[in-house]
């Protein structure tokens, strides 16, 4: 799933009402997704808005194995604060470190969106044993920018994904 898939990407504005979208991880979404993972024998990587406690929120990805078992979570470490991406208003940087999850099909590493611009994140995760890197992402065309600038940013995004694969000898999956 793409980044924060249970709603539209809400970080394009600073709105306290959006904190109502947060949930515990594991929690209701992971319970439902565990049933689906087991039913379809697939690994599910789900990006969620995590409420850790009152006033402490994370951009978190949960990993559920093909047997429905919750394997754990990764919390986004690099939090942007750019026009249209006001994530520092919502999220605290992750505190779980870079992790590798041993699934039925492969050892996978999870990094989230803005983490992609920091090559050490991909490197550390692959050195820890990841065979595939997954990047749940929410990057789009900025309506206030001209087409040429949007295209340049899109090309940079494509290039950074490819470079992680080549430099680290792994597959990279970016879900946007």
Where are these regions (language model features)?
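Beta-strand-turn-beta hairpins that frame and shape the catalytic cleft
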Residues: 100-109, 131-132
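Short, acidic, Ser/Thr-enriched surface-loop or helix-capping motifs
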Residues: 65-66
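A short, polar/charged loop-to-alpha-helix boundary motif
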Residues: 76-90
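Metal-dependent catalytic neighborhoods of phosphoester/phosphodiester hydrolases
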Residues: 5-25, 53-57
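Short clusters of small/polar residues that mark proteolytic maturation junctions
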Residues: 75, 112-113
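CN hydrolase (nitrilase-like) catalytic-core segments centered on the catalytic cysteine
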Residues: 25-45, 113-176
